[in-house]
């Protein structure tokens, strides 16, 4: 400990609170005090969780609740598989058509490899979210999602979701690569490539 730290700790050790400002009637073990700040009810305007026509409308609720992340009755692994397949399939196009090798013969393969690399990075981030020391955050029910999946927000559920995401992402990228490589798209591919050509 340096001289400055020692002198600072010695000067602050003598600080005492005035007894007239201490409320001894409230103890940390009181149930009412401990729980009153942890409860965040749905549609509380003080927290900003409002039921608006957008987030509580029929179309929005039907759309959000049918996404693989919130759909009822499927396992965390299948949730990850379906989400990863959508990511891999949709990321393949921008990587192959706008990548640095877009004007070469290797554009489709480079797009596949870049997409698989991006899926690996996203999978690594999902693994870090489930790092030891804290469990994944459990989403409370709100105006849009009444019943969030409880099995997903455990350590094993999130690990299953992550492994399914990796497999689905790589599989979706390979499926998009196979579709683009078919003979039916040979007439369209030069047109699409020339849209983003800069030279």
UniProtKB/Swiss-Prot annotation:
Task: Enumerate the Pfam families for this protein.
Answer: PsaL
* Spans traversing the lipid bilayer: 108-128, 165-185
One CC-aspect GO term: plasma membrane-derived thylakoid membrane
Q: Where in the cell is it found?
A: Cellular thylakoid membrane
Q: InterPro entries, alphabetically? A: PSI_PsaL, PSI_PsaL_sf, PSI_suXI
* Record's signal peptide: none
Keyword Transmembrane helix applies: yes
Q: Which UniProt keywords apply?
A: Membrane, Photosynthesis, Photosystem I, Thylakoid, Transmembrane, Transmembrane helix
GO BP term, pick one:
photosynthesis
Provide the membrane topology annotation.
Answer: Multi-pass membrane protein
| Main location, first listed in the record | membrane
As for family, the record states:
Belongs to the PsaL family.
Matches recorded under NCBIfam families? PRK00704.1-1 (NF001925), PRK00704.1-5 (NF001928)
* Name of the featured protein: Photosystem I reaction center subunit XI
Provide the species name.
Prochlorococcus marinus subsp. pastoris (strain CCMP1986 / NIES-2087 / MED4)
Read off the lineage from the record. Answer: Bacteria, Bacillati, Cyanobacteriota, Cyanophyceae, Synechococcales
**Gene name, Swiss-Prot/TrEMBL:** psaL
